[in-house]
């Protein structure tokens, strides 16, 4: 008998692969803002029941930061300091097929 089901939301950033780049930027803007809403809504829950989000690439997060409101920035930082929102260290995902000449 199944006693517990764990759900994990997952997103993946393929800039320009699944949709044109402007569409991907808009989608990730929505993802970040929805993550802020969910993290705030669940912040008072027990730690194992809180919503947590990691922005997968810094490129999307930097674009969102540049174009969002001061209120959203403040909310984002507050949640970051609580450990509910974080940002990965890679600006973009790079294909493992790239050699050093393609990266430079």
Locations of the language-model features?
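Carbohydrate-active enzymes and regulators
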Residues: 1-104
């Amino acid at each position: 008998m199944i006693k517990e089901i764990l759900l994990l939301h997952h997103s993946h950033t393929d800039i320009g692969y699944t949709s044109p780049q402007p569409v991907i930027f808009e989608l990730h803007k929505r993802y970040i803002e929805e993550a802020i809403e969910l993290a705030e809504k669940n912040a008072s829950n027990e730690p194992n029941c809180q919503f947590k989000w990691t922005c997968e690439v810094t490129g999307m997060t930097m674009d969102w930061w540049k174009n969002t409101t001061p209120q959203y920035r403040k909310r984002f930082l507050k949640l970051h300091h609580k450990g509910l929102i974080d940002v990965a260290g890679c600006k973009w995902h790079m294909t493992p097929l790239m050699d050093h000449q393609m990266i430079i």
